Regions:
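Alpha/beta-hydrolase active-site loop
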Residues: 83-114
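Cap/lid segment of the alpha/beta-hydrolase catalytic domain
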Residues: 42-43, 67-95
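The feature captures the conserved acid-bearing segment of alpha/beta-hydrolase catalytic domains
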Residues: 148-220
Length: 292
């Protein structure tokens, strides 16, 4: 248990290939945040395990998969999730998830000596709702959000990996006070669960990977954007198994060696889906919650 919030005991699982007592040099760490539209999901889902084990055994990372509070679960169950309420509920939900991510990060950093972890090499990684959470965490650090007081003094992630994520802001645009940690973005441009570009809604916005990558490029901030034309929300999980070489390259060069590269890779499949260029708030709600 890394934190208790109300009636929720938030737990984490640690995956490592070498006991801390046998480690000569401190290992990098990956904190993973699961997906599930902020209404479902588990930190120990079987679909994630091969990726965790690969990162631990082949790449030498200690992987820490965390719980976080699912802020849309109760509003959905109570029938309070609608196009009218969503622009207020989503930012509150993401804020709560980032608070839990920061608490977990602080907990892990505090265990760094015991676990043989280098606190300067902690990478945040997430899928879907978890990807939104880690990107939001990086955005808050870059903008010195008051919530960052939960982190160790001067802390920043060594890198961030987002499998089909976005940043949520109560504004029509994202504004970065400074460049964030190196960011890797995977996204399909036919995703109907998380916008590939941007969705603006009642004074708030959900800014997807394409939008973020363009801003990072303008700032000359290191990033790796892996875009798949015609791919849907499968990019929330597929890269963990099928795009490991790209992930390894990002972690080695842009995170480990601090190579100031800005990489754009685009793939296209013969069975591509059409882009949803008119992504709306109704699209988001229908795709994520209609059958839940």
């Amino acid at each position: 248990v890394y934190s208790v919030k109300g009636g929720d005991s938030l737990r984490l699982d640690r995956y490592t290939d070498t006991p801390a007592a046998e480690i000569d040099a401190k290992k990098p760490c990956m904190i993973f945040v699961f997906g599930g539209a902020f209404i479902s999901g588990t930190r120990d889902a079987e679909s994630y395990r091969p990726f965790f084990e690969y990162m631990a055994r082949e790449q030498g990372y200690t992987v820490v998969s965390i719980d976080y509070r699912l802020g849309l679960k109760e509003p959905l169950a109570a029938g309070k999730l609608s196009p009218e309420t969503f622009p207020q509920l989503l930012p509150q939900t993401v804020l709560m998830a980032v608070e839990d991510l920061y608490d977990a990060t602080s907990f892990v950093a505090g265990k760094s000596a015991e676990w043989g972890i280098d606190p300067a090499r902690i990478v945040a990684c997430g899928s879907s709702a978890g990807a939104i959470t880690v990107l939001q965490g990086a955005y808050f650090i870059a903008n010195e959000n008051p919530l960052t007081a939960k982190l160790p003094d001067g802390f920043d992630y060594a890198g961030v990996i987002s499998f089909a994520g976005a940043v949520v802001d109560m504004a029509d645009d994202l504004t970065w006070k400074r460049a964030p940690a190196p960011i890797m973005l995977f996204h399909g441009d036919a995703d109907s669960n998380v916008p590939y570009r941007a969705l603006r809604m009642g004074g708030a916005g959900i800014f997807g990977s394409d939008y973020i990558a363009r801003q990072l490029s303008d700032m000359k901030s290191p990033y790796y954007f892996y875009s798949v034309e015609g791919a849907d929300h499968a990019l929330a999980t597929v890269p963990m198994n099928n795009y490991r070489d790209a992930i390894d390259q990002f972690l080695t060069q842009q995170v480990g060696e601090r190579l100031p590269a800005m990489i754009d890779t685009k793939e296209r499949y013969s069975n591509s889906l059409p882009q949803d260029k008119d992504f709306t708030i109704e699209t988001y709600i229908q795709s994520n919650f209609a059958t839940k």
